[in-house]
């Protein structure tokens, strides 16, 4: 096992002579990763374009075909790296409160409900909930707001309690900019692909019961009670996000269908920046078998095209969770004979790139299997989270306890990890406050 320098019982630093920045492991000795993970992180840490340090969470682990482990945060002042993030922009989770409790939710009703959910929340399906082509374009451009109007969504707080209000695309990006970065053909595919949970990536829909509360004052602010049932959902942007990502990364396409769809999309790519994309395609070929990471200068035309594709396709992650929630809403009504209250506490991505201010610098933060956990000051524009800090939830792993907490203090460059979830029928939720505070100490700039 490579040697690490212990900062405290839950923080360890790893850096070899060849590395430009260190890796900070947010973990104890018992949870340090395997050699392959260390090797990947060492290779990444050699890149001179990185900023400060690489943060690696307690569940950091390699995935086949990926150059960067899941459970990492990587930062650069100048560059965007498509191989740092998995090809699933805005894979994420949403936490849904309900008005269900033991008085109105029996074991028989749970069985009846899950039989219904198997039909309306599929893990595998060729066609999900079909939407109009223009709505697919509007989702990419404007986020979930037009979709919620189309669905006539009954879920409370769905827009305001989605991270970034359910839209990663900046206001200055036009529809034409999106068509210059993503082939229109992909939108014709994407309009059929919402409402599918997905079988890859440990995607799930869990029903959970709150069994313990550690801070009643905070729990009351979040409208959480002992005995209350909630849903936790994990899924991403689906095939649309994959196709848009594969256009800009040297990562090997895992299936023949991905290669075929990418070929069709790029062959009939009606972009005003075709020459720029040709340059990108040439770079991708050069980095196909390289140990180095392909990086786009963020201010270049290539970087702007990649970022637009990433952000626009990421909106399909918010949209997929919104459609699945609508399907859940209708299923609950059929089973219970009434409208069951669904109230979104938070929807948060864990695969995304975003410009943020850390250590007084504007930097590009790449989160791969990790979430942001901003304190009240950074959440100052939200009516509730400006008081509590950003909500964070760690899901169950095959019926182990799950945890919910919030970031009560400001921390520099200290995002939290997503655990390794699995499908489970009924789990138990505990409410913890500041349970991770020892894991997120500010770190000095390298």
Where are these regions (language model features)?
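Domain-length cofactor-binding catalytic modules of enzymes
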Residues: 2-43, 49-56, 62-70, 74, ...
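A short, polar/proline- and glycine-enriched secondary-structure boundary/capping micro-motif
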Residues: 93-96
């Amino acid at each position: 096992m490579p040697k690490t320098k212990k900062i405290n019982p839950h923080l360890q630093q790893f850096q070899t002579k060849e590395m430009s920045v260190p890796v900070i492991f947010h973990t104890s000795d018992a949870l340090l990763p395997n050699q392959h993970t260390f090797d990947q992180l060492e290779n990444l840490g050699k890149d001179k374009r990185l900023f400060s340090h690489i943060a690696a969470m307690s569940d950091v682990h390699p995935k086949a075909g990926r150059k960067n482990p899941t459970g990492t945060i990587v930062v650069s002042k100048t560059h965007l790296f498509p191989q740092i993030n998995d090809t699933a922009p805005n894979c994420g989770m949403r936490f849904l409160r309900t008005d269900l409790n033991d008085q109105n939710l029996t074991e028989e009703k749970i069985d009846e409900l899950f039989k219904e959910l198997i039909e309306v929340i599929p893990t595998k399906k060729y066609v999900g909930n079909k939407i109009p082509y223009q709505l697919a374009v509007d989702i990419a451009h404007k986020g979930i707001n037009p979709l919620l109007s189309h669905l006539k969504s009954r879920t409370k707080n769905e827009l305001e309690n989605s991270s970034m209000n359910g839209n990663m695309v900046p206001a200055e990006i036009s529809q034409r900019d999106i068509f210059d970065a993503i082939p229109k053909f992909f939108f014709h595919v994407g309009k059929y692909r919402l409402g599918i949970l997905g079988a890859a990536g440990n995607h799930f829909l869990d029903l959970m019961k709150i069994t313990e509360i550690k801070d009643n004052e905070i729990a009351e602010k979040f409208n959480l009670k002992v005995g209350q049932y909630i849903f936790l959902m994990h899924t991403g942007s689906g095939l649309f996000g994959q196709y848009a990502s594969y256009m800009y990364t040297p990562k090997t396409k895992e299936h023949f269908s991905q290669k075929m769809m990418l070929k069709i999309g790029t062959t009939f790519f009606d972009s005003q920046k075709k020459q720029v994309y040709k340059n990108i395609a040439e770079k991708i070929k050069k980095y196909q078998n390289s140990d180095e990471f392909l990086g786009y200068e963020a201010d270049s035309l290539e970087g702007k095209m990649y970022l637009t594709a990433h952000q626009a396709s990421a909106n399909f992650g918010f949209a997929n969770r919104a459609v699945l929630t609508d399907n859940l809403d209708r299923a609950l009504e059929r089973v219970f004979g009434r409208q069951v209250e669904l109230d979104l506490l938070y929807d948060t991505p864990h695969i995304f790139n975003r410009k943020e201010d850390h250590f007084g610098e504007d930097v590009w933060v790449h989160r791969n299997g990790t979430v942001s956990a901003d304190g009240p000051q950074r959440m100052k524009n939200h009516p509730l989270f400006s008081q509590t800090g950003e909500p964070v939830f760690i899901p169950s792993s095959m019926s182990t306890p799950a945890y919910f907490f919030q970031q009560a203090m400001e921390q520099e460059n200290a995002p939290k990890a997503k655990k390794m979830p699995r499908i489970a029928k009924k789990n138990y939720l505990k409410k913890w406050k500041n349970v991770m505070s020892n894991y997120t100490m500010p770190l000095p700039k390298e």
